[in-house]
């Protein structure tokens, strides 16, 4: 059997708590190090993890990865990345968490890495996509031992582990800087109407309205209402502000990587606002061909990010394209908050691919081109379609 030390992705919840003795009893490791990675969770979660680790008698590390996570979130903004219509949050956080745990494992000379993910979710794949590129063994006790929640509760009670049945509430909640997800319980039923108390970041949309100016440099958000802000602070500020107008709620049936459909409820006020502003600015500064191709890039970027393979060679190629096109995406967009929406209402940039004279109905000639010059284009437009339809009709 293996020996040595294993680094465990540790939240202090039921799954990771029971993993601690199981990694010793079932896997043969001598010691377990719990690693909790900060990607913007509430402070109470870190306190709970520290207390649980102390009660279990395991070494515990807390790693601050908020800056790295915020940078990846802004990469997602540059890519207009959404999966099945919602901003990626949990998916973006997992590779950052996995990297941080791997760094601790390497620094502490650990022989293996472990997580408490089930065999039905996406997170097992996202963690292991990072870890299996290393020389460490990977352990997944919940999946590999076929554990159920009922078994875990009974096991914890028998060994007097610091877990109380039901202490995690009716819902399964995952929070980070970019999004808050709520699932489980009755929310698993597609026809169940969730109560208002599942929401913590967003107020119910009302008639109250407001505006905010978002400034971008090379596709990256850098200021709110003219005040320069670091990424973490900018996201936190917009979460509070947009959330107060009910912006950023999603209730959906999500297709997971293993083929399961799972109902998810998300809150993502800052993400919704920044994505809307960024896309509006692109509409001002990119050509039609660039916008069309960027849509395909966005879909592929989001898919790879959802899968947790942000180090995939394709991502390097996609980011290379974005580096080129985003160089022009600098300017300011005004967003209106109204009825739970973030709606772009103004945009400006020195790189605007726009001519007010050319678009005006009151201008006859622009850059030597007159309205009448469009006649030849109009005659040819749709020409091939007319030929095809005539040929089809003639063969009936």
UniProtKB/Swiss-Prot annotation:
Major place of residence: cytoplasm
Pathway entry: Amino-acid biosynthesis; L-arginine biosynthesis; L-arginine from L-ornithine and carbamoyl phosphate: step 2/3
Keywords (A to Z) from UniProt: Amino-acid biosynthesis, Arginine biosynthesis, ATP-binding, Cytoplasm, Ligase, Nucleotide-binding
Biological process annotations from GO: argininosuccinate metabolic process; L-arginine biosynthetic process; urea cycle
Residues bound to ATP: 9-17, 116
GO cellular component terms listed in the entry, alphabetical order: cytoplasm
Positions bound to L-citrulline: 86, 122, 126, 172, 181, 254, 266
Catalytic class of the enzyme: ligase
Domain of life the protein comes from: Archaea
Reaction catalysed by this enzyme: L-citrulline + L-aspartate + ATP = 2-(N(omega)-L-arginino)succinate + AMP + diphosphate + H(+)
EC number of the protein: 6.3.4.5
UniProt-listed Pfam families: Arginosuc_syn_C, Arginosuc_synth
Binding site for L-aspartate: 118, 122-123
InterPro entries, per database record: Arginosuc_syn_C (IPR048268), Arginosuc_syn_N (IPR048267), Arginosuc_synth (IPR001518), Arginosuc_synth_CS (IPR018223), Arginosuc_synth_type_1_subfam (IPR023434), AS_cat/multimer_dom_body (IPR024074), Rossmann-like_a/b/a_fold (IPR014729)
GO molecular function: argininosuccinate synthase activity; ATP binding
Protein location: Cytoplasm
Gene3D superfamilies hit by this protein: Argininosuccinate synthetase, chain A, domain 2, HUPs
Subunit annotation: Homotetramer.
Family: Belongs to the argininosuccinate synthase family. Type 1 subfamily.
Name of the protein described by the UniProt record: Argininosuccinate synthase
Source organism of the structure: Halobacterium salinarum (strain ATCC 700922 / JCM 11081 / NRC-1)
Lineage: Archaea, Methanobacteriati, Methanobacteriota, Stenosarchaea group, Halobacteria
Gene that this sequence comes from: argG
């Amino acid at each position: 059997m293996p020996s040595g030390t294993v680094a465990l992705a540790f939240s202090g919840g039921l799954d990771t708590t029971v993993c601690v003795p199981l990694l010793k009893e079932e896997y043969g490791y001598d010691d377990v190090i719990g690693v909790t990675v900060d990607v913007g969770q509430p402070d109470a979660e870190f306190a709970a993890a520290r207390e649980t680790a102390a009660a279990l008698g395991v070494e515990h590390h807390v790693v601050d990865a908020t800056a790295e996570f915020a940078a990846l979130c802004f990469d997602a903004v540059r890519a207009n990345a959404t999966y099945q219509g919602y901003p990626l949050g949990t998916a973006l956080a997992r590779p950052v968490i996995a990297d941080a745990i791997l760094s601790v494992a390497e620094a502490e000379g650990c022989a293996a890495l472990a997580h408490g993910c089930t065999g039905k979710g996406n997170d097992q794949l996202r963690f292991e996509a990072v870890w299996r590129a290393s020389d460490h063994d990977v352990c997944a006790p919940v999946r590999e031992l076929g554990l159920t929640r009922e078994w875990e509760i009974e096991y914890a009670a028998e060994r007097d582990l610091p877990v109380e049945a039901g202490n995690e509430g009716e819902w399964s909640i995952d929070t980070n800087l970019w999004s808050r997800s709520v699932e489980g319980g009755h929310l698993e039923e597609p026809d169940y109407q969730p109560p208002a108390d599942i929401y913590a970041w967003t107020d119910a949309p009302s008639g109250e309205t407001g505006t905010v100016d978002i400034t971008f440099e090379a596709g990256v958000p850098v200021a709110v209402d003219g005040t320069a802000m670091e990424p973490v602070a900018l996201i936190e500020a917009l979460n509070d502000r947009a959330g107060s107008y009910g912006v950023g709620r999603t209730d959906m049936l999500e297709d997971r990587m293993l083929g399961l459909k799972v109902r998810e409820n998300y809150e993502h006020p800052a993400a919704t606002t920044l994505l809307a502003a960024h896309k509006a600015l692109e509409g001002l500064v990119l050509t039609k061909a660039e916008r069309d191709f960027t849509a395909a890039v966005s879909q592929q970027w989001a898919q790879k990010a959802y899968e947790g393979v942000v180090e995939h060679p394709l991502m390097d190629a996609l980011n290379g394209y974005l580096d080129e096109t985003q160089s022009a995406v600098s300017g300011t967009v005004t967003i209106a908050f109204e009825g739970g929406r973030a709606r772009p209402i103004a945009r400006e940039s020195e790189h605007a691919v726009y001519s007010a004279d050319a678009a005006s109905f009151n201008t006859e000639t622009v850059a030597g081109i007159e309205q009448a010059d469009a006649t030849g284009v109009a005659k040819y437009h749709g020409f091939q379609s007319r030929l095809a339809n005539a040929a089809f009709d003639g063969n009936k």
